[in-house]
């Protein structure tokens, strides 16, 4: 508690009087819990009309999810999917509130988080529907690393920005869950995506390492946090070793997971940034530099359009766009030359993937049409993160959680 109070003021935002027009443009999305309710491109198996013979076979589950995602019409109602609030969405809203200095929104958001089906207890979070990918099945009510990290970071950011150490303690519980339940030690250390899969997925590993390192650093630089710091760094180095000569990473370690896309690359960079801020490790910084150069050079068009793959740009996806704005803006705040990229992607996104009347996001843009389906977690939540990070960058400020971590680690001297 004492440590938390000591750093809480360091990261605190200055309050409502400093909010820029960027927040007004964001429509104060994070302040209205009802706006967090919606459907998801991967929620097909939440549909009450999906028959058991589909649910009982892995391949059919995957087909159902992919059809729902790819059909350019909203099938949620036909499938019987009721709009719902996702834990990860609330985590993003908490982080956005922290960046805007909007402490008043935090109690309602933490209440909404507790009410989600993805809030599983013990610091673990998951998705509210069954997910079948080409490499894993994780049912509703099972923890996964991505949801856990985004919620935990939202809680930690809200705790730092509002001076509420209990929220940082909740984030530390999530990090403890990742450390104890998702850590694989052999043949090399890494953090697993789910409890049941042994696949090494690099973006999950980097984000898990970032969460563990971040919360350990906030806990103080002493013998009690040394094992967590060491484990996080070792896990990050496992995926750093998988970085290719051009600075890219495959999605995962298996041969059939060799693709590289925009938003998972951004997740890699985000996780690496957190590890570097928490440790100052030169090996992490070198890998991050290489990854940023590749991402900047190969994943964006001249107007800021976010390519899906370097060699196959379409579709331009709102998740790629929002994540790119967020990560590029935060990298720029720490000295990387990505500020202009964040601005270009933001301008392109507002023109092409945001409804000008409601502010709701569109799913994807293709050559001759825009898929205007609205998915809150996939689109609104990540664009809210991007808008909030860009607002801070324009004001010459940094993410309050990242400031607290960097000050605790010594990466950012107290005088800065």
Predicted features by range, described:
Residues 6-416:
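Glycan-recognition and catalytic cores of secretory/periplasmic carbohydrate-active enzymes
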């Amino acid at each position: 508690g004492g440590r938390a109070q000591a750093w809480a003021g360091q990261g605190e935002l200055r309050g409502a009087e400093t909010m820029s027009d960027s927040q007004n443009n964001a429509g104060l999305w994070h302040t209205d819990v009802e706006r967090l309710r919606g459907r998801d491109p991967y929620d097909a198996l939440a549909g009450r009309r999906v028959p058991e013979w589909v649910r009982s076979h892995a391949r059919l589950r995957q087909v159902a999810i992919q059809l729902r995602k790819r059909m350019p019409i909203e099938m949620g109602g036909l499938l019987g999917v009721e709009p719902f609030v996702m834990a990860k969405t609330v985590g993003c809203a908490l982080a956005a509130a922290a960046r805007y200095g909007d402490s008043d929104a935090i109690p309602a958001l933490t209440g909404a988080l507790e009410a989600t089906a993805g809030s599983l207890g013990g610091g673990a979070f998951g998705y509210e529907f069954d997910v079948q990918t080409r490499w894993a099945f994780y049912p509703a009510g099972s923890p996964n690393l991505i949801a856990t990290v985004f919620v935990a970071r939202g809680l930690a950011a809200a705790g730092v920005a509002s001076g509420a150490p209990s929220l940082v303690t909740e984030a530390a519980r999530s990090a403890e869950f990742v450390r104890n339940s998702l850590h694989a030690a052999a043949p090399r250390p890494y953090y697993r995506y789910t409890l049941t899969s042994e696949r090494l997925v690099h973006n999950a590993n980097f984000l898990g390492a970032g969460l563990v390192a971040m919360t350990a650093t906030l806990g103080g630089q002493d013998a009690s946090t040394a094992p967590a710091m060491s484990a996080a760094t070792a896990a990050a180095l496992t995926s750093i070793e998988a970085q290719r000569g051009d600075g890219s990473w495959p999605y995962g370690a298996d041969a059939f997971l060799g693709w590289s896309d925009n938003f998972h690359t951004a997740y890699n960079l985000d996780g690496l940034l957190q590890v570097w801020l928490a440790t100052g490790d030169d090996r992490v910084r070198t890998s991050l530099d290489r990854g940023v150069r590749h991402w900047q050079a190969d994943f964006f068009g001249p107007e800021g359009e976010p390519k899906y793959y370097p060699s196959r740009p379409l579709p331009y996806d709102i998740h790629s766009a929002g994540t790119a704005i967020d990560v590029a803006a935060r990298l720029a705040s720490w000295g990387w030359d990505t500020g202009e990229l964040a601005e270009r992607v933001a301008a392109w996104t507002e023109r092409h993937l945001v409804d000008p009347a409601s502010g709701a996001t569109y799913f994807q843009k293709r050559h001759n049409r825009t898929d205007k389906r609205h998915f809150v977690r996939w689109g609104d939540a990540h664009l809210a993160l991007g808008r909030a990070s860009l607002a801070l960058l324009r004001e010459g400020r940094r993410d309050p959680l990242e400031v607290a971590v960097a000050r605790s680690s010594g990466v950012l001297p107290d005088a800065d």
